[in-house]
């Protein structure tokens, strides 16, 4: 899978906004690392690359920007107002939609929270969320314990099945869900 950095030349008219978002996200996530030890920014880069791969839209630059920024409110000192000022209402709104409410998760559990949230978020936000989930399942074969992998797989499939029953999905959503399920099929 190409990273957004490798896809830059394919996104020519969108570079300025996306480059600004990448620079902001890189600075915001500085010093953060994934469980595999890689720099955290590699995750938003891959999410942006998946959005680029699967989504065709006149707002693609804004979707890619939101993909880069999707964890900034949740995992850094960034606020919704910061993003709105720098990137506009659409990008800031998408990131806000993608930001988990930790108090709500504590009340109802992560699986239920994600299911409800994904059923009601905007179509654009769902594209980014599914791209995020696709990137997260890429690491599943080598992550944690076999029991954790089986639980994560079962929860993800449950969320996706519920999503398919309770929401009208676009072709883009369906393609990303298919890619997620294909990757999960590789997991024991």
Q: Where do the model's predicted regions map?
A:
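Active-site helical microenvironments for divalent-metal-assisted chemistry
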Residues: 3, 7-188
């Amino acid at each position: 899978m190409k990273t957004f950095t490798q896809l830059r030349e394919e996104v020519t008219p969108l570079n300025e906004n996306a480059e600004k978002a990448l620079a902001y996200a890189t600075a915001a996530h500085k010093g953060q690392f994934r469980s595999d030890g890689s720099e955290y920014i590699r995750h938003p880069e891959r999410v942006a690359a998946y959005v680029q791969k699967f989504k065709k839209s006149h707002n693609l630059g804004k979707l890619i920007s939101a993909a880069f920024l999707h964890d900034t409110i949740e995992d850094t000192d960034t606020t919704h107002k910061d993003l709105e000022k720098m990137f506009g209402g659409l990008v800031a709104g998408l990131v806000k939609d993608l930001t988990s409410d930790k108090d709500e998760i504590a009340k109802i559990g992560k699986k239920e929270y994600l299911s409800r949230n994904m059923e009601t978020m905007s179509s654009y936000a769902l594209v980014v969320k599914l791209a995020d989930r696709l990137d997260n399942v890429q690491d599943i074969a080598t992550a944690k314990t076999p029991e954790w992998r089986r639980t994560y797989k079962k929860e993800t499939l449950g969320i996706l099945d519920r999503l398919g029953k309770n929401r009208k999905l676009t072709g883009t959503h369906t393609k990303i869900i298919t890619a997620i399920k294909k990757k999960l099929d590789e997991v024991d």
